[in-house]
Amino acid sequence: MTYQQVLENARTCIGPYCKACNDCNGKVCRNTMPGPGAKGEGTGFIRNAEKWREICVNMDTICENSQVDTSFTLFGRTFEIPAFAAPVGAMRLHYGDKYDDLAYNDILVRACANAGILAFTGDGTDPKVVEGAAEALKANGGCGVPTIKPWDMDTICEKFALVQESEPFAIAMDIDAAGLPFLQGLTPPAGSKSVEELKQIV
């Protein structure tokens, strides 16, 4: 399957915010909430895409003619390439009805494990999202990184305890999600974390 075929297939079942553009640069989906594009000024995604383009891989032809080794080691574990799958949550809200979070995480974690890399899994207001991610990670030897939103401390501890049962490679928190609308106005408060709170989490 070519990249163009992947995009054409995606356009039949993705949306309404992601357009499966030929060039995924955040311009068409900018300032959509919810959605994959950056909120506010809508430049975060665009700037990230521009920065990626500054990184180039140059072919070296003055070397031994052998298989290129793209592997690297992180925290004592070796992976096939220095790239991991990013965490995505609320699949149907952002990307259409084809996959819910449970089905998506099951496919993603298994595929990444088979490819020799890690899958970061998402989080959301539905507790089943993290529960499903934990199940997928456990079924694949903990080959992934569950990513928890910056909830209140009690909820964070509950979710950490849940995902630790799957013995994941690591656990992450996308603290920049503090600006998401669904975290605003919660009781107890969710969102930004003080240095002291971060010390408790780490």
Language-model features: locations:
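Alpha/beta enzyme core
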Residues: 110, 138-139, 151-202
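A glycine-rich phosphate/pyrophosphate-binding beta-strand-loop-alpha-helix module
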Residues: 103-143
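An N-cap/entry alpha-helix motif that binds or orients negatively charged groups
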Residues: 2-80
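Metal-dependent C-N hydrolase catalytic cores
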Residues: 77-96, 100, 104-105, 115
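Short alpha-helical segments and helix-capping/turn motifs at coil-helix boundaries
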Residues: 67-72, 106, 131, 155-161
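Active-site mouth loops of central-metabolism enzymes
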Residues: 88-101, 145-154, 185-189
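Hydrophobic faces of well-ordered beta-strands that scaffold small-molecule active sites
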Residues: 83-86, 117-121, 142-148, 171
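Conserved active-site and cofactor/substrate-binding residues in soluble primary-metabolism enzymes
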Residues: 39-47, 103, 107, 154, ...
